[in-house]
Amino acid sequence: MNPTPLESRFDTYAAYRQAVADTVMLARRELVVFDPDLRETGLESPAMEQALRAFLSAGRDNRVRIVVHRPDEVERACPRLMAVQRLHGHGLSFRQSPEDLRHLSDCFLLADGRHAVIRFHADHARGKLLIEQPDEVSGWRRRFEDLWGLSVPAIASTTLGL
C-alpha cells in the first residue's frame, strides 16, 4: 500500500534529518543522494546506519547511489557509512561531482522516484519533503541521472594494499 501523498516544508536541521529518515524508511528499491558532503543528512547516525543496512539487505537489487562534491570529507566524517559500504559495496556507490559543477548548492535525496527530500541550499536547513509525488520527483530524478553521468567514481568499497 502506498503512503498518502504529502508535501511539507521544514526549516530546521532536526526536521530535515527526520525527513531524510522518513524517506529512507519508505525506500523499497533505490535511494539516490546529491549533497556536497552529507554532513547534515543524518545518514551517519546509528539509526540510519541500521536502516541503510536493512534496506541493502532486503533485496540484492537494492541500490544507494550518492554524488558528493567532497568525498574525502565523507570518508573522514562518516565511518558508519563507510562500514555500510564495506559490507554492501555492491549496493552503495559514491561518485564525485565534476569540478565545474561544484558550485551547485542544493541537496536532495530521492527514494524510488516517488519520494524526495530537497534542501534549497546546502548552507540552510530550509526545504521540503515530498511523499508519493512522482510527477514532481521526476525532474529531480533526471537531474540526478545527469549528475551521476558526469561524475567520476569515488570512495572505493575496498582498500587495496600489498
Map each language-model feature to its residues.
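Interdomain hinge/linker segments and adjacent boundary elements that couple functional modules
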Residues: M1-R39
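Signature of lipid phosphatidyltransferase scaffolds
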Residues: F10, F120-L162
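Terminal leader/tail segments of proteins
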Residues: A14, A54-F55, R63-V64, E145, ...
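Amphipathic coiled-coil/heptad-repeat helices and related helical stalk/stem segments
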Residues: Y16-R17, M48, A77, W140
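Primarily the HKD phosphodiesterase
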Residues: T23-H88
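HKD (HxKxxxxD) catalytic microenvironment of the phospholipase D
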Residues: L31, S93-W140
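Long, hydrophobic, amphipathic alpha-helical segments used as structural scaffolds
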Residues: D35, R63, V68, L92, ...
